[in-house]
């Protein structure tokens, strides 16, 4: 919310009277993910956002007192999660190989806050567990499905970034259906429709999944 997070209430009356103040709702994690994918935001950050919708809440929302990620007027913390700070963190994550583990966490903490930094670091740490995209397409029914949820999310985001044909999407959907979590499958479905609508809209495997899982949409 612009009026709260930018502290417009601190403006002097004669200054506030010269501008128009409009309350603007924050994007949901799904809305931010669509923008982030279109703007090449780092994949580990997008994976973290996909699994951490509470980071996109406002302190004005109910029951956010214990939310460790967001801005709160009562907190002295200068770094917190916002759509802007997540985007600002992207170059840091992209250059993660130049940082020590501690330096990376410290840099992220100074950008999105300590709680988010430690949580994002978890997603970065599982990157080496990802199955190659080409290996999935080569044998979608038998290639190993990683058990770790963070790894699965990283993989489906890579697929959303990479898929460009119905044939490859059909193969990857066979792999996605082997994932035990319907939530992960739903993220893949949603991201494909938002970011690759031309191949998702008329894809048989995607449409069959939507019909079978209409209850969780």
Please give the residue ranges for each predicted region:
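Short, small-residue-biased leader/transition segments that mark boundaries at the very start
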Residues: 1-8
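A short helix-turn-beta junction within AAA+ P-loop NTPase domains corresponding to the substrate/partner-engaging
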Residues: 9-30
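Generic structural signal for alpha-helix starts
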Residues: 12, 38, 42-46, 113, ...
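Compact nucleic-acid interaction/catalytic patches
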Residues: 33
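Conserved AAA+ ATPase small/helical "lid" subdomain
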Residues: 36-109
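Generic structural signal for hydrophobic core residues of well-folded globular domains
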Residues: 89-96, 124, 160, 192
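Accessory nucleic acid-recognition modules appended to NTPase machines
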Residues: 101-168
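Terminal-proximal interaction/regulatory segments of ATP-powered molecular machines
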Residues: 145-217
């Amino acid at each position: 919310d612009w009026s709260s997070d930018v502290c417009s209430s601190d403006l002097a009356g004669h200054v506030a009277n010269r501008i128009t103040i409009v309350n603007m709702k924050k994007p949901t994690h799904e809305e931010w993910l669509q923008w982030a994918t279109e703007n090449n935001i780092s994949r580990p950050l997008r994976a973290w956002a996909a699994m951490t919708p509470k980071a996109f809440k406002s302190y004005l929302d109910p029951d956010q007192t214990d939310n460790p990620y967001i801005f709160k007027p009562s907190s002295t913390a200068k770094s917190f999660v916002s759509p802007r700070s997540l985007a600002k963190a992207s170059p840091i994550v992209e250059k993660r190989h130049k940082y020590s583990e501690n330096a990376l966490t410290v840099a992220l903490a100074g950008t999105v806050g300590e709680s988010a930094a430690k949580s994002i670091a978890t997603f970065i740490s599982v990157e080496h567990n990802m199955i190659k995209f080409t290996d999935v397409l080569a044998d979608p029914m038998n290639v190993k499905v990683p058990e770790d949820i963070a790894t699965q999310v990283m993989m489906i985001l890579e697929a959303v970034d990479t898929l460009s044909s119905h044939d490859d999407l059909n193969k990857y959907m066979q792999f996605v259906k082997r994932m035990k979590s319907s939530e992960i499958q739903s993220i893949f479905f949603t991201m494909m429709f938002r970011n690759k609508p031309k191949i998702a809209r008329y894809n048989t495997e995607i449409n069959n999944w939507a019909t079978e899982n209409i209850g969780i949409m």
